[in-house]
Amino acid sequence: MERWAAPKVTAGSARRYVADQPSFSSTLLDAIYKSMDEQPGHGGGATGVEAVAAAAKKQHEAALHYGNYYKPSLAGSYRARAPGPHATTSSSSECSSYGGFSSSEAESSHHRRLRPIRTTVPGGAPGPAPEKKAKKPGASIRAKLRDLRKPASPGARLAGFLNSIFAGKRAPATPPSATAGAESACSTASSYSRSCLSKTPSTRGQAKRTVRFLDSDTESLASSTVVDRRRVPVEAVQQMLLQRMEMESDEDDDESSDASSDLFELENFAAIAPAGAAYRDELPVYETTRVALNRAIGHGYGHGRSARVV
């Protein structure tokens, strides 16, 4: 919306503005002159003057009422009806109809629209943050017990085992030993002797250690006795094993001799006959049904040996 241009104030308009809003004295004089013109031949001048004064007073009160009450309310209504931040000015016809509300006064009422005061709290405003509850020491213990009661899965057990292995490897660095500190402190021979004498650990409450000196013969004898003690159990074990093997072999021999279907008492005439070569052309006779022994017997029979197995 375009703003109307304010009319320029000239001398004639200034006089008209003064005439539109006359003072109380000028209004009173105008009323007196008017009454004198209307009643030139009557003798009631005092009554006419009082009536004129009352009319002038009434007009002045109306002007004061307009200036004190109606004018500010009109300006406020214009600001409220304005579409933009600035109020529009009124025309000259409106100024004349409202009893002298000129364009210059309308320019003075050109104010920025006031913002309404917010008296309610918006609903989207965040409320106060809730206070954090202090954790009780017993709560953590209960939580740990609850976790222990739960059945552990194989994967969790494996992970715990691996973590324990890696945690064991990451052992903290051991502090320097007392001997290293003593050696660093003993820089010279004199300080070394003094420090060693002063830093000897107390043997109170510890087991006593004895040192014995042995010659070479005694040492060799002691070592041989230790070796003999170590050898005795080995030899005893070997003897026990040999006896066990002999007993098992005897049991096997007894079982093989008792089996009548396994061995046969046959004689080999090829070994004792004078013409032993005559039996070599015949088929061999076996004394057992075992295939491995039969092969050995056949091989021996071909060479003229005895094929009897005892």
From Swiss-Prot:
Q: Which UniProt keywords apply?
A: Auxin signaling pathway, Cell membrane, Membrane, Transport
Gene Ontology, cellular component aspect = plasma membrane
Primary localization: membrane
Kindly list the biological process annotations in GO that this record carries.
auxin transport; auxin-activated signaling pathway; gravitropism; positive regulation of auxin mediated signaling pathway; regulation of seed growth; response to auxin
Query: What conditions trigger expression of this protein?
Result: Rapidly induced by auxin (IAA) and analogs, indole-3-butyric acid (IBA) and naphthylacetic acid (NAA). Expression level is gradually decreased as the panicle matures.
UniProt-annotated location(s): Cell membrane
Q: Any keyword Cell wall biogenesis/degradation?
A: no
According to UniProt, the tissues expressing it are described as: Mostly expressed in the vascular tissues of leaves, culms and young panicles, especially in hulls.
Q: Where is this region: Disordered?
A: 77-140
Bias kind Low complexity: ranges:
90-106
Instruction: Say what happens when this gene is deleted.
Output: Decreased sensitivity to auxin and N-1-naphthylphthalamic acid, an auxin transport inhibitor. Reduced plant height and decreased panicle length, and grain size and weight. Altered auxin transport.
Q: What does this protein do?
A: Involved in auxin transport. Positive regulator of the auxin signaling pathway involved in gravitropism, plant growth and grain development.
Q: Which family does it belong to?
A: Belongs to the BIG GRAIN 1 (BG1) plant protein family.
What protein am I looking at? Answer: Protein BIG GRAIN 1
